[in-house]
Amino acid sequence: MSTSSTPSAKPMAEMAAEFGLKPAEYDVVLKRLGREPNLVELGVFSVMWSEHCSYKSSKNQLKKFPIDGPRVICGPGENAGVIDIGDGDAIIFKMESHNHPSYIEPYQGAATGVGGIMRDVFTMGARPIALLNALRFGDPSHPKTKRLVDGVVAGIAGYGNCVGVPTVAGETNFHKGYNGNILVNAMCVGLAKADSIFYSAAPGPGLAVVYFGSKTGRDGIHGATMSSAEFSEDSEEKRPTVQVGDPFAEKLLIEATLELMATGAVAAIQDMGAAGLTSSSVEMAGKGGVGIELNMDMVPQRETGMSAYEMMLSESQERMLAVLKPGREQDGHAIFEKWGLDAAVIGYTTDTGRLVLKHHGETVCDVPLAPLFDDAPLYDRPWVQPALQPRLDPAAVPAPTNWNEAVLKIIGCPDMASKRWLWEQYDRHVMADTLEDSATGCDAGIVRIHGTGKAIAVTSDCTPRYVQADPYEGGKQAVAEAWRNLTAAGALPIAITDNLNFGSPEKPETMGQIVRATDGMAEACRALDFPVVSGNVSLYNETNGVAIPPTPTVGGVGLLEDYDLRTGFGNVAEGDTLVLVGETRGELGASIYLREILGREDGAPPPVDLALERKTGDFVRGLISSGLVAGVHDLSDGGLLVAAADVALASKIGVTLNATSQTHAHAYLLGEDQARYLIATPDPDAVLEAAKEAGVHANVAGVAGGEAFASDGLFSVSLDALRAAHEAWLPGYMSAPKA
C-alpha cells in the first residue's frame, strides 16, 4: 500500500498535532491500526475525530435531551429531524453553525452555511420551504463589525434568494463578546411526504456509490478541523479552508435529488458537508454496517493534479453521495445529465467493514470503519459550577432620570432597533406561501402548507446575556421563549432543533456552562413536551483565549391546523385594550434596561417557572382559538415597554400604558419576567374572566389609540419619534463612513 498521497517531510506525529489530534488521540490511532497511518489515513482520522464531526466533548451532554414524541418520525442521528404534521405530510428541519468560516470570509462563510443546511434537509427527501438565521456580531464600534455584518447578510441573501427559498425569521444581536468570533447559525425547514423519508445508512454490500453535483476542488480542505479550533490573530490566513458556494448549482442539485428519489432508485443518500467525501462515505457505510471502497480516479475534479488526501478532505460545495439500488445507475445518469450535473460511480459498498481508497492503481487508504464512525474518543470533561449573579432588588435599581430619553434609547439600541436594513435584503415571499415574516409583526415566521389549510410557525431564540449570568436558567429560557413565540403566533409547539455555541470545552469554566445550559434546556424540553429532533454543536468559539458569551440557540417549529387562526401584533385597532397575561415581579437582572440605560451587565436573569410557562401558554392558545384576541405578543427583551412599543409600531397606532399605580414603575415596565404575553382585545372583561377561571394572572396594562406612545405621568413620545428611533440605527451605522 502507498504510504503517502501528498508528500510530507514531517513526522506523522507532528502532522497529527497540526491536524488537531492530541498526542493521546494519535496513540489511539496507532493502536487501532497497529501501524503508523499514511497522510491520507491521518487526514481521515483527524477530520472524523474532530469536535465538529465526532461531538466528543458534548455527546454525553446531548444524551440528556428528550428526543421522542408522538409526532417524531426521526430524531437526532440523521441529517435532520423529521416530525409528522398529519395528512401524510412531514416537516424536516435542522439548525447548524458556520461561525468560524463566516468570521474569516463573511460572504462565502454565510452563503455556504445556508447551502449546507439546505442540503441536510433535502437529502432526506424534503423540498426546502423556509430559512431562518441567528446572527451574533461584535460591538458596533469594533473595526471589523461593519464589514462582517455587510458580508454575512449579503452572503445569506445571495444564496437563499438565488436558490429560491424564503428567509422568514431570525434574530440579530451585537455584543463585544463576539468581537473576535461572530456566530452565524442557519436553519432550514422542508416539506416531505411522511412515507418517503430518505436515510443515510447503506443497506448492504455490492451497491454502487454515486457522486453527483459540482466538481471537487481544493476549497475547504480541513474546514472541519478549523471549525474545531479556537482563533488567534492569524486566523484570517485560514481563508483557503473556507468553502465557495454556487447557489445556482444548489438549485439544480435540489431538483435532481428530489427527481432521483421519486424514481425509487435511492437506497441511501448523504450530502457532502463537513469533512466532505470522508464524512459522507464513512457515515453511510458505518450506519449500514458495511465497508466501502472508492476509486479516487473517478471523482469529478475541478483542479488538476489533486491528491487522494485533497479529494477526501475537500469541502467543495453542492455535492452529494448516493448508494443506488442494484441496476439503477442508468436512472441516475439520465437525471444528472438532464440537470447538467457532474456524476460518476466512484465505488461500491463491501462486506469488509473497511474504508479502502484507491488512486492511480495504488491503495492509498485501508482502515477499519468502526474507529472512524462510532469509536471516536469520548470525553467526560471536568467542569466547575458557573459563578452566579445575585438577584437584583427592583428597589435598589435606579429608575430613569429622563423617561422619554430612556424609551427612545432602548427602542433604538443595536439589539432592539429595527433590522429592516438586514431582512429587506432577503426574499421573504418567494414560493408564495409566506403568511408572516420579519416585516409583519408576528413572533414567528409562518409558512402555509401549500394546498391545505395548515401552516407551520418557525422561530429562533436565545438570550446570551441570561446564559452568561446563569447558564441553567438561560438554557431553560431559550427553550421557553421559542415555545412562547410559537404560542403567541397561534401555533402548537411541536419540536426543536438547537445550535450550541460555546468556547473551549477543555476549560472547566466553559464546560460548566455547557453542562448547566444543557441541563436547563433538557428540563424545559421535558416540561413543555418540546423534543429535540436535530441540532449542532459549535465549540472552541474563542479568540486569543477569550470565549464568546455562551449561546445555545433554539430553533422551534409549531403547527397551525388552521392558518386563519394565526395571530400577530400588527392589526391592533383603536380602542383595543391591552391585557398583560402572566405574573410580574419586576426582574431587572441581566436586562436590556440595565445594560443600555445604566451601563451595567450584572444581576441574575429572570427565573423560568416551567409549570407556569406551560399553564400560561396553554391559556393563551385557548384564548386565540376562542376568537377573543385582536393581537398577541410575547414579552422578552425590554419587558412590557418594548412589547407595547412593538405593538404601536407594527399596528401604526398609539399605546398608553398604566404604570403609575405600580410601586416600582420602572421594574413593572422594563422587567423581563418570563411566561408573559401582551394580549390586545376588544373585550377585556371576557379575557380577564377567562384568566380568572383558568387561574392565570392577568391585568389591564393599557389601551391602544391616539398618536403617542405613553405612560401617564412618566413618558410620552410621538409615534413618529418612536419610529424614527427604532428605524435609524442600523441603516445609519451601515452607511456611515469608516472612522
Swiss-Prot record:
The active site is at H52, H98. InterPro entries: PRibForGlyAmidine_synth_PurL (IPR010074), PurL_linker (IPR041609), PurM-like_C_dom (IPR010918), PurM-like_C_sf (IPR036676), PurM-like_N (IPR016188), PurM-like_N_sf (IPR036921). Substrate binds at S97, H98, N99, H100, R119, Q243, E315, S316, Q317, S538. Keywords: ATP-binding, Cytoplasm, Ligase, Magnesium, Metal-binding, Nucleotide-binding, Purine biosynthesis. GO terms for cellular component: cytoplasm. The keyword ATP-binding applies. Mg(2+) 2 binds at D120, D271. It is found in: Cytoplasm. Mg(2+) 1 binds at E96, N536. ATP binds at Y55, K94, D498, G535. Disulfide bonds: none annotated. Its EC number is 6.3.5.3. Monomer. Part of the FGAM synthase complex composed of 1 PurL, 1 PurQ and 2 PurS subunits. Part of the phosphoribosylformylglycinamidine synthase complex involved in the purines biosynthetic pathway. Catalyzes the ATP-dependent conversion of formylglycinamide ribonucleotide (FGAR) and glutamine to yield formylglycinamidine ribonucleotide (FGAM) and glutamate. The FGAM synthase complex is composed of three subunits. PurQ produces an ammonia molecule by converting glutamine to glutamate. PurL transfers the ammonia molecule to FGAR to form FGAM in an ATP-dependent manner. This is Phosphoribosylformylglycinamidine synthase subunit PurL. It comes from Caulobacter vibrioides (strain ATCC 19089 / CIP 103742 / CB 15) (Caulobacter crescentus). The gene is purL.
